[in-house]
Amino acid sequence: MDNNDQISNLCLGALQLLADQPISVISNEPSEEQRNEHVLKKWENNVLRHWKILFSLFMQTCGDSVQGNAAFSILNFMTTNSLVGQLYQRLYDESNSLGFISSPLNETEHLSEENLKIESSITFTSEEIEKEKENIKSVLLPSVQSISSSLELYASKESDYRSSIEGVLADLKLARARWEIVRNVTQILLLESGISFLENKKLAYIMDLCGDREDNYSSY
C-alpha cells in the first residue's frame, strides 16, 4: 500500500472519529456523558494517533510544502477545532524544531567525545611523563651516588692530606729554628776567631751556608 492509499484510509478513519464524536465533545458546553474523563481521553488519544500518522505521511509525501497540499488543507479545514488545532500546531512546531535541537545535541555529543579523547590523551601523557621520570631516576641515581661517594672520599683524603702537610710544616719550622740557632752560633765563632775565611774555601763555604735563607715556612 503506497502513501496515497494510507493517507486516504487514515483520512476516512479520522473523519469517522469526528462523525462518531462531533466537535461538541471539546466545546464549552459538553454533555453529561462527554464529561466523562475516560471517554474524552480515549477519543483524544485516537484522534492524536491518527493525526500523528497522517502528519508523518504528509511530511514524507509533501515535505516542507505540507501546509500547501490541497488534501491536507481540506482535512485540516474539516477538523479545525481547539483540540486538533493544538495537536497539529504542537506537532508542526516539534517537527520544525527537531533540526534546531538535533544540531546542538550532535554538537554536544561531539564535544563530549572530544573531551573524553583529550582527557584520555592527558592521562596517557601524564603516565608517560611519570615513566620518563622513573627512567631518569634509574639512570641518574647510580651516578649521583657514585659522585657523592667520590666527594666524601675526596673530603676524607683532603682532611688526611691537610693533617699530614700541617705535620710536615711543623717539623720544617722546628728544623728552621734549630738551623737559625746553629747558623748564628757558627757565624759568631768564625767572626770572633779572627780567621780570614776568604782565604779558606771551606770556611767561605760555611759562611755562605750561614747566610740568610730565602725559605721561610712561617707563612704556612
UniProtKB/Swiss-Prot annotation:
The keyword Cell division applies. The keyword Cell cycle applies. It holds the Pfam family CENP-H. It is found in: Nucleus; Chromosome, Centromere, Kinetochore. It comes from the Eukaryota. InterPro entries: CENP-H_C. Keywords: Cell cycle, Cell division, Centromere, Chromosome, Chromosome partition, Kinetochore, Microtubule, Mitosis, Nucleus. One of its GO terms (cellular component) is nucleus. Its main location: nucleus. GO terms for biological process: cell division; kinetochore assembly; mitotic sister chromatid segregation. Component of the inner kinetochore constitutive centromere-associated network (CCAN) (also known as central kinetochore Sim4 complex in fission yeast), which is composed of at least cnl2, cnp3, cnp20, fta1, fta2, fta3, fta4, fta6, fta7, mal2, mhf1, mhf2, mis6, mis15, mis17, sim4 and wip1. Belongs to the CENP-H/MCM16 family. Component of the kinetochore, a multiprotein complex that assembles on centromeric DNA and attaches chromosomes to spindle microtubules, mediating chromosome segregation and sister chromatid segregation during meiosis and mitosis. Component of the inner kinetochore constitutive centromere-associated network (CCAN), which serves as a structural platform for outer kinetochore assembly. Fta2, fta3 and fta4 associate with the central core (cnt) and inner repeat (inr) region of the centromere. This is Inner kinetochore subunit fta3. It comes from Schizosaccharomyces pombe (strain 972 / ATCC 24843). The gene is fta3.
